Amino acid sequence: FGSCRWAAPAVGESDPVGPDVLDTLSARLAADPEAERPDVLLLLGDQVYADETSADTRAWIARHRQAAGTGSDAPPDQVADYEEYTHLYDESWGDPELRWLLSTVPSCMVFDDHDVVDDWNTSAAWVADMRATPWWHERITGGLMSYWVYQHLGNLSPAELAEDELYAAVLAADDATEVLRAFAERADADPASVRWSYRRDFGRTRLLMVDTRAARVLEEQHRTMLDAQEAAWLRTQVIGELGDVDHLLIGTSLPWLLPPMVHFAESWNAALCRGERGPRWARFGEWLRRRADLEHWAAFTSSFERLTETIAEVGGSDAAPATVCVLSGDVHHAYVAEPVWTTGQPPRSRVFQFTCSPLHNSVPAAMRVGFRFGWSRVAKGIGHLLAHHGRIERPAIRWERSGGPWFGNQLMTLTLRGRTARLRLEKASADAKRGRRETDRAGARLVGILDRNLTKGG
């Protein structure tokens, strides 16, 4: 699992962000057909970048708009509508290694912001600003239409597809464009009308992929990551219908546990935005929120607390799974964090935050320093000062990283057998010789960074 993948360049072109880890995974699997393969590949957001396009795509967009007479109001370096999204998906998933991988290994996906636009649904003020632009309606409509076609359909089981009214309508139509358009417009206008989250059971392992973008409630005094229906659905899957499960996996594009300083900074910012320190601080808070991407679980305080309570409840039950693992991406580095409950009965399950990103992208050097600093004792002290200024209560847990941060194009693998669990982290390395077995077309291969037992006997 992992997230954040720019399209790989064409053969022979230089790659400014290094080798694509999915291409290298594909090359390793293809080199030994008898070797063990992943049971499932989880892509945790930013599968495409609608707002950060390649030079080739920008040139195609210009030609297309001139010929079709469309997109005149849209940014020239971003996709504008469904037709342009189809080109973006073709570019992103068209390289031979990735096409083979997606045709060979089952996959589950969920969107994040760049699948539509950076900071998608970060706040009510942001939504109002975007809806005032002349190009936003076509962007969000095309983004949701294409997401349903290229990503979400593959998340549905055969039984779910057989009962899906939209799928039936699309199959029955000669041209399903207007059917899909009406669906996407309704999904944008009324997010509660559609559920993008879903559940998959792999034997005694349950996977819940949670939509943390479209299901938000953005009114400042009642901000939640998940609306009431979505939150109730998640709780039902975790508590009400869990049954005999050895491992519970919660896939959320945005990490639950961040570096502590970042967590408190986001909680402080949310307090400012809802007026805890007055209107002037609220205006500053909104300005800062958009520029610093302060929109993870920590920025939705009640949702963070509810998810934490739900994990503690399932982990403390008589039928507690061996592990509860939150799988995330987004932040362009990888780490392992483990919480400790400071109040109440701690869960019997081992609880982990596994964050792995990017698959094929980069992070500036200054941000690498910041991510490392965010876990330090000094940074925690700064975070506590911000929390005090924002009049924020301490959470019911504290947490430390037990691995990382790691940087580069990387992929985490969970191996679950019975009630045992093992975690592996691998990075795409360009140091291999071209043509060597298990190398991709750029001559890169996977290099092991971490291999750790998570449970006794793992």
What are these regions (language model features)?
Residues 1-458:
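Metal-dependent phosphoester/phosphodiester hydrolase catalytic core
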